Amino acid sequence: MDFRDYLREQAELHPAMKPQDAMKMIYQASFGAEHLLEDEEAARNYLIQELEQVPTTTRIPLFEDISEDMCRVNLGAWKGKGLPADWLFKIFALSASEHKNGEETFVKLLEEADDAAARGWLEFTHEEWQEYKKEYLKDGIRAVHHSDSYRKAEAPAYRLAARCFCRLAPVLEKAAGHGPAVIAIDGRAASGKTTMAGALRLILDGSVIRMDDFFLPLELRTEERLKMPGGNVHYERFAKEVLPHLGRGEAFSYRRFDCSRMEIDSREVEVPPSPWQIVEGSYSHHPELGDYADIKVFSDIDAQTQMERILIRNGEEMAEILRSRWIPLEEEYFSTYKIAEAADVKV
């Protein structure tokens, strides 16, 4: 989809859209919401007040995409799912960082809006759009409110968010219904497990334990061990150094496997105290670790996108090693233990 498609989709969802509302969408897609966060405490309090006042609903989508990178989070739907205001504010604040090339993006999206209006895709004529655009540009690029007619008909109540946070919604819903918990994120290589864990850490003020720190040492990589599904993770050390601390919210430390030296590092990884503990990485749902996780998440990806990401991230040589050796081992583990099927949440 390009921006014209997002405009068209918004026009279909909200027939009261006027040229002013399209311009607001262009500005939001280009610059985000940084201008709304000059006073974080005031912005937080305003969100809490607005959530208290907005009607609870399950009839509208939680997210509405407005560009390739940005979406609107509907407050009524957020409230309807019982999600905390503080989590939404953190998502909003994390999404409001300075957008690069904002003016360049604005000019590009303006051209796409011209084309969408000329094609008759929007709820106003091309002439109306051109007239509004001309008047708007006289005072330079700036944020605008929704039009009066849009506010009256649509009663917009939302916050902007980066679309990367949309993927977390099912996990956050599960977490909200559970309370402080141990979350384990398993899944396919390059599916976004690390990114997801990092985002959850920021939203939940959580701590992260990485399964990459528990690669199997060379001396344990016997033919017999590697024939075992999921045998290439050092689950014995994880069980000894990590499991006793999970679910307690306490600070602790563990040793990490140093891939550059192919041995366990004597320096320890410090895990800060937190009621939300996130175990991230392949084999984090291994049955040898027991049923330690309160919420099991499986992160999925299709094979083509997976290899495209691995090529960009790791280069051709490592991509071939992953494709021919490590990914088949992962897939055998997923299949043998029905890892995806046993997860509480699949994203």
Language model: regions and residue ranges:
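Long, basic/Gly/Ser/Thr-rich N-terminal segments
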Residues: 1-147
